[in-house]
């Protein structure tokens, strides 16, 4: 970049490329470096495959345990509250970190992506929680664009709803958070959302349609058994994610050592 500071499209000439000096270790050292980096890459790929398998296992267990033989109910029946987000852009605060405003961009594969999270100050938090103050165990659902994914809010953070989201609060006497989270992400419910979207210019789910989502309601005992299974899988997932993070840091360090 220092070679092309004033051009619109960054580029290097053939002369500049030919002038670049790169280290050239002995061939046996090159082979050793390649072997070490390949091993690190293989382990990273393995950890990612293991994470994908855990996701498949959770979905497979859900299909195995729950079926249409149970009473079919609406989301409105099993929830004490279903509320839409405020239809306004939050006033974000680059300093405050106490009040995360969760948007569709933070809802990825059923989990919260904290890397892109934005935050609001206390006054904006109060404004955006007038309808309902989110609590741990609530489900935040992406209702526009890449709609249909959702997350369970964890304890320890004062969330408010960002744009293009809605919140489901399960009635604890009827439905667990883990079951509702998984059923809202299931193919049958996604198909209902797709059907309600027919002809829409901008893909989205209306709150009236979301309240009418239909799905089986198994006994709480069975829901809790599934929840225990998911929690055990999550422990395994955390271990693998920690291993993956260490491997990625190690690979970057090796790249820096060999080529930096």
Per-segment meaning from a language model:
Residues 4-28, 143, 159-166, 175-178, ...:
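A short glycine-rich beta-alpha junction/loop motif
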Residues 1-3, 108-120, 139-162, 178-182, ...:
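Short, ligand-facing micro-motifs at secondary-structure edges
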Residues 19-35, 46-86, 212-224, 231-260:
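Non-catalytic DNA-recognition/assembly elements of restriction-modification systems
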Residues 70-112, 125-129:
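Low-complexity, Lys/Gly-biased intrinsically disordered segments
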Residues 130-133, 158:
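Residue-level "contact hotspot" at macromolecular interaction interfaces
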Residues 6, 127-128, 199, 238:
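Short, solvent-exposed loop/turn positions at domain surfaces
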Residues 54, 133-134:
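Short, well-ordered loop/turn sites that connect or cap secondary structure elements
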């Amino acid at each position: 970049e220092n070679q092309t500071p004033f051009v619109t499209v960054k580029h290097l000439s053939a002369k500049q490329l030919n002038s670049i000096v790169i280290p050239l270790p002995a061939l046996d050292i090159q082979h050793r470096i390649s072997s070490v980096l390949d091993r690190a890459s293989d382990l990273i790929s393995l950890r990612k495959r293991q994470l994908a398998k855990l996701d498949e296992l959770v979905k497979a267990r859900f299909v195995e345990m729950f079926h249409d033989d149970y009473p079919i109910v609406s989301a409105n029946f099993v929830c004490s509250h279903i509320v839409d987000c405020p239809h306004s852009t939050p006033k974000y605060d680059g300093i405050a970190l106490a009040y995360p405003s969760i948007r569709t961009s933070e809802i990825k594969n059923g989990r919260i992506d904290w890397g892109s999270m934005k935050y609001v100050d206390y006054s904006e938090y109060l404004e955006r929680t007038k309808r309902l103050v989110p609590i741990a165990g609530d489900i935040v659902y992406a209702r526009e664009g890449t709609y249909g994914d959702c997350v369970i809010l964890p304890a320890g953070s004062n969330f408010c709803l960002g744009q293009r989201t809605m919140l489901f609060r399960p009635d604890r006497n009827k439905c667990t958070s883990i079951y509702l989270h998984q059923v809202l992400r299931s193919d049958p419910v996604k198909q209902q959302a797709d059907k309600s979207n027919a002809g829409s210019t901008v893909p989205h789910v209306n709150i009236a349609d979301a309240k009418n989502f239909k799905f089986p309601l198994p006994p709480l005992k069975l829901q809790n058994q599934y929840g225990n299974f998911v929690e055990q899988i999550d422990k395994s997932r955390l271990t693998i994610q920690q291993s993956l993070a260490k491997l990625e840091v190690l690979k970057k360090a090796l790249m820096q050592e060999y080529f930096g």
